[in-house]
Structures are given as C-alpha cells and as structure tokens.
C-alpha cells in the first residue's frame, strides 16, 4: 500500500497520479519505489494541514471475499520524522517563552518507501535511514512559536537524514527569559542519532539560567506517542 503520494513532487511532468502509476505497468515494484521520491522545498516547511505525509506498508489480502468486499489490516509507515520541543516536560518555567525555532540543514527530498527492511517488532520499526543519492541540504525554515510557554509540538516534520559533524540537522531555539531574548543551537549530531522515518524526536528544555538553556533529547518510536525510550544528556 502506497498512500498520500499526490502533490508530493513525484510526477514532475504534471501527470495525474493514476497516469503516472500506469507508466510502471510491466516494471518491477522496486522500480516504482525507487521513483517515488517526494520533495521538501516549501519555504514554510512541511505543513500537514495542506500536505499529507506519504505512507507505505504491506498486507496480505484474504482469498475469501465477503459480499464483494475484501477487508485487510495494514500497518503504514510515515516517510517523515517529527520533531517536538518541550519546556520542562511541558510544565514550563516561570518567565520563559519560546519565540521562534529555525531548522537548518534538513534535506530537500526523501523516499516514500524505504529500501531498508523494517524490524520484525512493530514497536521498533525502521532502524536505519534510507536517503536518495541526490538529496542535499535545503534552506532554513523558520517556525513562529507564538510565545509558547510549555511546548512547540506537531509542526516540524523532517525527511530521513544521516547526522554527522559535517552535515547535521540543527534547531536554533530563540527564546525570552525574564524579559531577555536569547538563542541556542541544538544539533542532532551531538547525540549521534540519525533521523529515521516514522520516529518522533523530542528536545526537552530541562533547565534555564540567565545565560543559557540545557536540553535533553527524547527518542520515541511507538506510533508517535510521546513515550520516553532513552534520555541521553545534552552537553
């Protein structure tokens, strides 16, 4: 099952999705998957209110048909990861607010279907990123936090990415604490974690001082529920 591939920049010659898919008749399913590359170039970032996230999954269709209807269950994997920023486990700090978050170095495209094999445990899913060879870093995306005091959630979505010292997704958090505006950059490379599809990453601002903020990164895999799996220190 390949879902939500309309308006993803895949069929660049402006064909309708149906016509584009018919072009793969006689080709292998892998040829279709290799061509299913979405673009991530909107200056506002990925807005799920206007653009659905591509998803993929497999299922077995039963041979028995009930009154002309075939019913089957299918687990779908989202092609993007989600990033949230919390303030003190969503409890906030007195005098602290988030002003804006600038995301740098995210990639400009990604595969709708991963070429990696998902883990057999459904709660683990994919453990490796799968990235188009022509993917490259795109321009910064700025998110207005509208003076949020406890969290900025469910608004930052990113393609898969390998994070290292030379190219890593970075969030620059602009904030105000007791009337003084400051900013701090937090990077995925500091945690040695890649960005993997269908995962949720939570940066929790665990403490604030007059000069800086300290963060910890939560790594979440279970259906995007915000359940703590591991909490390495952010230093």
Give the residues covered by each predicted segment.
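Preference for bulky hydrophobic residues occupying beta-strand positions
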Residues: 74, 101, 173-175, 203, ...
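Tryptophan-paired
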Residues: 1-20, 63, 82-86, 90-197, ...
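A generic structural signal for beta-strand entry/edge sites
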Residues: 69-71, 168, 200
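Short, low-hydrophobicity acidic/polar segments
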Residues: 1-92
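Intrinsically disordered, low-complexity repeat and linker tracts
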Residues: 200, 204-235
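Short linear sequence elements within intrinsically disordered, low-complexity coil regions
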Residues: 38, 43, 51, 131, ...
């Amino acid at each position: 099952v390949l879902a939500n591939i309309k308006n993803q920049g895949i069929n660049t010659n402006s064909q309708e999705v149906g016509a584009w898919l018919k072009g793969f008749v006689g080709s292998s399913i892998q040829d279709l998957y290799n061509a299913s590359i979405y673009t991530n170039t909107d200056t506002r970032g990925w807005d799920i209110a206007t653009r659905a996230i591509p998803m993929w999954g497999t299922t077995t269709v039963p041979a028995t048909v009930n009154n002309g209807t075939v019913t089957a269950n299918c687990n779908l994997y989202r092609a993007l990861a989600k990033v949230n920023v919390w303030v003190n486990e969503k409890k906030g700090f007195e005098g602290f607010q988030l002003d804006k978050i600038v995301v740098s170095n995210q990639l400009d495209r990604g595969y709708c279907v991963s070429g990696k094999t998902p883990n057999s445990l459904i709660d683990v899913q994919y453990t490796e990123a799968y990235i188009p060879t022509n993917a490259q870093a795109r321009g910064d995306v700025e998110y207005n936090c509208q003076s949020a005091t406890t969290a900025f959630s469910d608004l930052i979505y990113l393609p898969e990415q390998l994070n290292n010292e030379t190219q890593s997704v970075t969030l620059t958090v602009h904030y105000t604490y007791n009337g003084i505006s400051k900013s701090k950059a937090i990077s995925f490379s500091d945690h040695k974690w890649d960005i993997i599809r269908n995962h949720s990453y939570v940066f929790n601002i665990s403490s604030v001082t007059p000069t800086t903020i300290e963060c910890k990164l939560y790594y979440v895999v279970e259906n995007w529920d915000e359940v703590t799996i591991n909490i390495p220190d952010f230093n």
